[in-house]
Amino acid sequence: MNAPHKPVLLNEVLESFKDRKGTIVDATLGYGGHSEALLKSNPDIKIVGIDQDSEAIAFSKQRLASYGDRVQIIQGRFADVIEDILQTHDVQGVLADIGVSSLQLDKKDRGFSIHSENLDMRMDQNAELSAYHVVNTYDEEELKRIFKEYGEIRHSGKLAKAIIHNRPIQSATQLAEIAQKILPKNKRVHPATTLFQAIRIEVNKELDQLKGLLDALERHKPKGAKVAIITFHSLEDRIVKQHFKEWAKSCICPPEAMRCTCGANHALGNIVTKKPIVASIDELEENPRARSAKLRVFQFKE
């Protein structure tokens, strides 16, 4: 069966989990690229795959069917189901690829792309909140907030006013045209890219989901487990970096303390990747969409 989506940093993910025996949670199963490669590379691995996209779930069930009981697939948001998985499985690894798949971007009816005919952007097609709802019903202050927080857009107020003035906005292309008139031009990417990112994050509550996953891992501290997270923009990467940094701290005394009184034995594990791993030149030539991908890995103590 032809894979519709190239998994990013695949070799680096395989390297991260090559010594694992037991359950790997693929928190963003998607079209099964990372999971299939992990199953092929290591007969001692079992996969629990999670995704909220029903199209991706159907594809991955078929793609991974030959692996039988080595694979369990759950439909849902990873932050909502990870707690139960950590309680019921011997989790030896967690992988999360926090991004939109190529297929989601390329399918115009999903509304993720600036070239889409509609405004949707829901990863879970059954969810109530869509990009259309955000763009056409949020007030000016709400729009300004998500543009500033999730897109780090400097002209968030001006953009919010323009969107409200042009309502109703029916398509992604119409929204992109409005953004193009307001936002500074960029040689590398379309001016509307960060706007679409901000709306997508709001629709899918992506940062809340990421924080929920990390908080659950911190609570359960799965012994010896490796956590590998791929991010595609600075907001997500900052969250992962900060959590890993806090987890690796031995001393938790307040900064103003003159000397350590906590015992300096509070580290949950160690950061495996001192700097984020990025795509190789060869991968970028084959898959330009990997250009902004960053992989960070943490390992909990035994």
Swiss-Prot record:
GO terms for biological process: rRNA base methylation. GO terms for molecular function: rRNA (cytosine-N4-)-methyltransferase activity. This is Ribosomal RNA small subunit methyltransferase H. It comes from Nitratiruptor sp. (strain SB155-2). It catalyses: cytidine(1402) in 16S rRNA + S-adenosyl-L-methionine = N(4)-methylcytidine(1402) in 16S rRNA + S-adenosyl-L-homocysteine + H(+). The gene is rsmH. Its EC number is 2.1.1.199. Specifically methylates the N4 position of cytidine in position 1402 (C1402) of 16S rRNA. InterPro entries: RsmH, SAM-dep_MeTrfase_MraW_recog, SAM-dependent_MTases_sf. Belongs to the methyltransferase superfamily. RsmH family. One of its GO terms (cellular component) is cytoplasm. It is found in: Cytoplasm. S-adenosyl-L-methionine binds at residues 32-34, 51, 78, 97, 104. Keywords: Cytoplasm, Methyltransferase, rRNA processing, S-adenosyl-L-methionine, Transferase. It comes from the Bacteria. Pfam families: Methyltransf_5. The keyword rRNA processing applies. PANTHER family: 12S RRNA N4-METHYLCYTIDINE METHYLTRANSFERASE (PTHR11265:SF0), S-ADENOSYL-METHYLTRANSFERASE MRAW (PTHR11265). The keyword Transferase applies.
